[in-house]
C-alpha cells in the first residue's frame, strides 16, 4: 500500500503537525511505501500528488486540517484518508458544540461560559457566575494554543486577549485539577 502522510498546514498548530508526521512516518515505514507530503499553501495545489497514493494519513493539527475542510476536499476528489469525516471533524473542533452534544448524551463535561467577540467587543458573563480557577481558551484550537489557566479575576482580561488571537469565540471553562485525557467517542 502506498501511503502519503499529509503534514504542515497553515494553523497555529503547524509545528505540532511536523512532529506527528515524523512519528507516523517512523511507525509505519517498515511494511509500507510511505512518503511525507508537506502542505504549505492551498490543498488544491497538491491535488495531483495526493492522487498518487492509496491512502492519505492526516497528520495535520488545527485549522483546516482538523475542522473538516481538508476532509471534504479529499472526499470531493475520492481520495481515501484516515480520521473522521468532514461533519464529525467540524463538530470535534468546535469545543462548545462538542460539549453540548456530550451533555445531551449524559457525558459529563466541565461547566463553561461562551464569549463571542465582534469587532473587538464582547459581553462578559455575569462575574458572579465565573468561578476560579478556570480555563480560558479559543473554541476552535487544540494543542493548548491560546489557553490560559486563570486563578483570579486579575488574570482574566489577559487570558481573553490571548485566546482572542486565535478565535473570535472563546470559552471560560471550569478548571478541574488532574491529568488531562483525550478520548475518542464512537457511536
Go through the PLM ranges and name each one.
Residues 94-115:
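Short, glycine-/small-residue-rich phosphate/pyrophosphate-handling segment
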Residues 151-187:
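Phosphate-binding site of ATP-dependent enzymes
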Residues 123-136:
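Acidic/histidine-enriched active-site and ligand-binding environments that engage anionic O-linkages
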Residues 1-93, 97, 116-125:
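ATP-binding N-terminal substructure of ATP-dependent carboxylate-amine bond-forming enzymes
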Residues 17, 112, 133-159, 180-182:
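Glycine-rich phosphate-binding loop of ATP-grasp-fold ATP-dependent ligases
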Residues 80-81, 109, 134:
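Hydrophobic beta-strand scaffold residues
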Amino acid at each position: 500500500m502506498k501511503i502519503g502522510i499529509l503534514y504542515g498546514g497553515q494553523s497555529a498548530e503547524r509545528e505540532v503537525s511536523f512532529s506527528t508526521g515524523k512519528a507516523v512516518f517512523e511507525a509505519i515505514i517498515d511494511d509500507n511505501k510511505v512518503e511525507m507530503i508537506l502542505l504549505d499553501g492551498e490543498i488544491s495545489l497538491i491535488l495531483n500528488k495526493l492522487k498518487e497514493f492509496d491512502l492519505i494519513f492526516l497528520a495535520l493539527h488545527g485549522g483546516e486540517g482538523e475542522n473538516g475542510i481538508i476532509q471534504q476536499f479529499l472526499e470531493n476528489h475520492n481520495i481515501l484518508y484516515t480520521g473522521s469525516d468532514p461533519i464529525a471533524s467540524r463538530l470535534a473542533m468546535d469545543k462548545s458544540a462538542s460539549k453540548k452534544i456530550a451533555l445531551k448524551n449524559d457525558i459529563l463535561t466541565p461547566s463553561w461560559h461562551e464569549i463571542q467577540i465582534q469587532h473587538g467587543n464582547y459581553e462578559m458573563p455575569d462575574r458572579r457566575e465565573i468561578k476560579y480557577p478556570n480555563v480560558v481558551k479559543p473554541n476552535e484550537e487544540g494543542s493548548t494554543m491560546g489557553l490560559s489557566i486563570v486563578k483570579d479575576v486579575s488574570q482574566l482580561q489577559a487570558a481573553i486577549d490571548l485566546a482572542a488571537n486565535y478565535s473570535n469565540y472563546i470559552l471560560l471553562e471550569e478548571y478541574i485539577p488532574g491529568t488531562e485525557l483525550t478520548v475518542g467517542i464512537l457511536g
